[in-house]
Amino acid sequence: HPTAVRTTLAGIKEAYPGRRLIAVFEPRSNTSRRAFFQDEYPVSFDACDIAVILEVADAGGYQGTARQVGALDVPELTRQIMRRGKTAACFRTVKEIEDFLCREIRSGDLTVLMSNGDFGGLAQTLPRALQRVLRNNTPK
């Protein structure tokens, strides 16, 4: 829900001023996957520095729902967030998000994963992927 996204991100930004905040969002619930909140979601990401969103077509394994009438248009949501002066990206798969985050995350960044499900296991795979990147980039 846009209010939950907005208050979560605003609270984190307030608690950690000066830190770069990366919001990673999976619109998985029936409510969040609908276009009903299309115009409310962009404002919800104002407190973050980077918004990363899983396309509805892959969110929660509901293949094809992005094509349904009334589904949240994630590419358009991404453009709306960018028009508000934020960096934003959308991806079709969790693996693409993981790869993007491994390139983007820097020391000191705060990364929050938002989903009402397991986000394709991202909370488990991302730390391991970041550790591999760190090991590969450490001078020997």
Where do the language-model regions lie?
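ATP-dependent carboxylate-amine ligase
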Residues: 1-140
